[in-house]
């Protein structure tokens, strides 16, 4: 078995029009790509010598053209198994807040995007490991929980 700890996952949120809630970004994988046609969060691998924070910010720019206004480190690490390569993957997770009017610029890995209202996010995430992070994001970051200042990454 292979074990990798060089992945990042980024939940991207933006305030909705009323500024009373948030919506989350999902990108649809291009049909010709791995997991083609599925809706995904921003994910990727760290490059040699790159920190997890730098990788999260780079993957955001590369996959969506977005820049984080705020970035939060989530406590849990997402862990999943890729059976085709017999690989256990540990992915460091972040939540990025972007400006409401931010424009999406997709890279060739993706062919569409959508913003999912906060209350619908759990039902739209394909992986259980992602769904387990939603309560922490909502409680600690979006609802200004007591951990929020400690999770904020200095950019």
Task: Give the positions of each predicted feature.
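Short connector loops at helix/strand junctions that flank enzyme active sites
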Residues: 5-7, 36, 41, 72, ...
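Nudix hydrolase/Nudix homology domain
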Residues: 34-38, 103-155
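Short, well-ordered beta-strand micro-motif
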Residues: 12-14, 93-97, 115-117
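Conserved N-terminal beta-strand and adjoining loop/helix that marks the start
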Residues: 1-25
């Amino acid at each position: 078995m292979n074990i990798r700890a060089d992945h990042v996952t980024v939940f991207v949120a933006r305030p909705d029009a009323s500024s009373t809630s948030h919506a989350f970004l999902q990108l649809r994988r291009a049909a010709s790509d791995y997991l083609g046609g599925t809706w995904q969060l921003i994910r990727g691998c760290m490059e040699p010598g790159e920190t997890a924070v730098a990788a999260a910010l780079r993957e955001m720019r590369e996959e969506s053209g977005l820049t984080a206004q705020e970035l939060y480190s989530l406590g849990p690490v997402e862990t999943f198994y890729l059976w085709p390569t017999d690989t256990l993957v540990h992915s460091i997770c972040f939540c990025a807040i972007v400006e409401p009017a931010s424009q999406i610029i997709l890279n060739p890995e993706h062919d569409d995007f959508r913003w999912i209202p906060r209350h619908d996010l759990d039902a739209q995430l394909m992986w259980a490991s992602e769904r387990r992070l939603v309560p922490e994001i909502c409680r600690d970051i979006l609802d200004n929980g007591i951990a929020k200042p400690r999770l904020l990454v200095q950019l």
